[in-house]
Amino acid sequence: MAPLRSSAITQGVQRSPNRAMLRAVGFGDGDFSKPIIGIANGYSTITPCNVGLNDLALRAEAATQAAGGMPQLFGTITVSDGISMGTEGMKYSLVSREVIADAIETACNGQSMDGVLAIGGCDKNMPAAMLAMARMNIPGVFVYGGTIKPGKLGGCDLTVVSAFEAVGQLSSGKIDEAQLTAVEKNACPGAGSCGGMFTANTMSAAIETMGLSLPFSSTMAAEDPEKAESAARSAEVLVEAIAANIRPLDLLTREAFENAISVIMAVGGSTNAVLHLLAIARTAGVPLSIDDFETIRQRVPVICDLKPSGRFVTVDLHNAGGIPQVMKLLLDGGLLHGDCRTVEGKTLREVLADVPSEPPADQEVIRPLSNPLYAKGHLAVLKGNLASEGAVAKISGVKTPVLTGPARVFESEEQCLQAILANQVHAGDVVVVRNEGPVGGPGMREMLAPTAAIVGEGLGDKVALITDGRFSGGTYGLVVGHVAPEAAVGGMIGLVQEGDSITVDAQQQLLQLNVDAAELERRKQAWVKPEPRYRTGVLGKYARLVSSSSKGAVTDQP
């Protein structure tokens, strides 16, 4: 075992006062030579995603002690994307990724911890933990809180997205208030993160693929006993990783990121994975660009039939073999790097050795590579004069991948949603929601409320929506987010005028404002940088520090 970092606070006569304080929190004579392991506990009653995390933290604490480590629990915050969606509060969602990462780094480095076991549930918890691990590079493992089980109504599976879409269905007269209430009461039946292949489940799958959480753990249901057992085993593995000196940057290689992108394409994951993986790679010092997602998309098919665009939820994926089954298919197809290491000290090829080469015959969630849902990945990178740094479109299930239409321009999500619910957005329109980027929002809000309302209105295949903000993992339709440069820093999206012709072409990866160059130059010269919406507080600080979405929207990189 390498020398323990914690010896800086536990060894020598000069550290007697330090030991005195540690004795007050449970250390005994024999404990000062053991590795100190931080357990970053995201427990919160704010959201069902995190409500079960304390039980996992306590199991991990006990397992750490039994394995020969000394656990120290500390709390991290969360912001519920689903609850804050469509409000000013959503501006704090992406910001919380940085706050959580900063908190984990601060606690672990401030207390000279030897390793960290991070437990999270809601969307930003996962990338935040990875950012912190990449910054510190001390042995670490991530424990996902688990997915929620599907709600049931009339024999159909429900997720929280069902409730968002029901709002649009009500406004278009397709359902009444009693039916809306029935969906509301049944959509979220218990603890766990939103149940489709939305952002939380996408990022947990990516972390499992990159080897920083245990096999099968990313698709377990939050309320099933195996979830707590996995938390305990994760603690044991972390103690072993400290002894073997296995560190995050040993695992977060270029090949590991390519594997994560491949799995995300195969399962039909969230657009937010682009932003988060770019941020983690940048922090880890791994060269990765938005163009790499397009390169991998071209060769990796979508083989999982999962919500929001498909039929099944994440517990169904787990029962069909989980992420290891998906990885085995990709590995056998030459689409995965099998030599990447995991926190257990094994290679991916070794981890997958006993996984069947074909998915179970009695399920329809995972398809063989020979019969994919879509021949290419679903996260397309679009470029053009509207997005010189790139934009991201989720095109799985899209019946209209190409649309040229008049721009309907909105300066905020609220303006856009009001127009949709007032039936002021029509088939063929290209909805533009701007000044919602990392700087302009600030915070790059997710546009689930407008997109769900569009679907609920029956316009999901007839309207395109583009934004310098983000989209929820629960979004589907012809939607293009992460448009960069954003409006607030002079991006072309800020020059669009009502009625301009815009082409969104997911097949040719094109996002184009069809206005002649002379007129665009005139508009550019007349453009005035908008005043910051916030000058002080967390959002003011974030807006001053944050990078472009094309670079992961991080706050600690030059």
UniProtKB/Swiss-Prot annotation:
GO terms for biological process: isoleucine biosynthetic process; L-valine biosynthetic process. Binds 1 [2Fe-2S] cluster per subunit. This cluster acts as a Lewis acid cofactor. Disulfide bonds: none annotated. Keywords: 2Fe-2S, Amino-acid biosynthesis, Branched-chain amino acid biosynthesis, Iron, Iron-sulfur, Lyase, Magnesium, Metal-binding. It comes from the Bacteria. The active site is at S472 (proton acceptor). The keyword Iron applies. The modification N6-carboxylysine is found at K124. [2Fe-2S] cluster binds at C49, C122, C194. Functions in the biosynthesis of branched-chain amino acids. Catalyzes the dehydration of (2R,3R)-2,3-dihydroxy-3-methylpentanoate (2,3-dihydroxy-3-methylvalerate) into 2-oxo-3-methylpentanoate (2-oxo-3-methylvalerate) and of (2R)-2,3-dihydroxy-3-methylbutanoate (2,3-dihydroxyisovalerate) into 2-oxo-3-methylbutanoate (2-oxoisovalerate), the penultimate precursor to L-isoleucine and L-valine, respectively. This is Dihydroxy-acid dehydratase. It comes from Synechococcus sp. (strain RCC307). The gene is ilvD.
